[in-house]
Amino acid sequence: TDDLPEFESMAEAWENMPELSPPLIENVLRQGHKMLIAGPSKAGKSYALIEMSIAIAEGRQWLGWQCAKGRVLYVNLELDRASCLHRFRDVYQAMELPAANLQSIDIWNLRGVTEPMDRLAPKLIRRAKKKQYIAVIIDPIYKVITGDENSADQMAHFCNQFDKVCTQLGCAVIYCHHHSKGAQGGKRSMDRASGSGVFARDPDALLDLTELELSEDIRKQETNTAICDACVEQLRRHAPAVLADASPDALLSHVEALKLCQDNLPPAVYEAFLSEIETIKRTVRQRTAWRLDGTLREFPKFEPKNLWFRYPVHVEDTIGVLKDLQSE
């Protein structure tokens, strides 16, 4: 005898189908399954995983997809403890969510003491057994890879460790990995993740981030919008009657909106606001744009999503500014 399951008759199962696992991320990933997020280092993958941790803990949306609410373990292999904790708080604040379910997020800080995944998995399982997590997030996996990442059999053994965590804890495992070297735009999503093809074919969902090349026109448009929004906020605070009477067109041009501020804000407030405008311009310059594509085992393929990475969070482009841009 062995410890493998017996063969099943389809005839016996036909009228008595087992329940499918409920979704963890609507139309993307089921509870108890595995997901890989791949992308270059500047894509903000760690921030995306922290956003996901928060969305699961609070039962909110992540990048436009509804998440099931539950407990989550974030395994931090890269950041020092203080940086990781600050990053969580920064992302919470940028997502503008009340921190109502902090008790649902646990962090395992392993920087400097990490081990290969085949030794780490049993320790993780033992510690997490009674915690009732619905997701374990491992960031990043290059820190725990055992063997040569270009070797199919060694990577199959490595990926099996994630299966053990899923099976024994009954939770999803989500992890991120870097892109292979070279231009990514012409490759399929499952060929972009670095290392053996096992990486891309093993998870139940593969999400892939590629950078979009921003035109100067779009940068100017974003700067204009950001300055107009800031002007509206200043007028709302200091000259609400002027804001109520202003024509909508005047509030869509940063030149006209700034003129309204200059004419109606107290001089000291306006001077301070001008230095704030310089910060806004710098912040907009630092924004990057991304296309999120996916290969899913359990759900139909979704239309690629276009995202802004507005440090420290990703924001879905809901108005279509990025839809015609090419990936780099």
Report residues per predicted region.
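DNA transaction DNA-binding modules
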Residues: 310-328
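Conserved inter-motif catalytic segment of the P-loop NTP-binding fold
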Residues: 12-13, 19, 25, 67-153, ...
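Phosphate-binding/switch region of NTP-binding enzymes
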Residues: 36-37, 42, 47, 135, ...
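Hydrophobic positions on the alpha1 helix immediately C-terminal to the Walker A/P-loop
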Residues: 48-52
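Pre-Walker A (Motif I) flank of P-loop NTPase domains
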Residues: 31-35, 70-71
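Pre-Walker A adenine-sensing motif
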Residues: 18-29, 61-62
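Short, small/acidic-rich helices and loops at N termini and domain boundaries
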Residues: 1-2
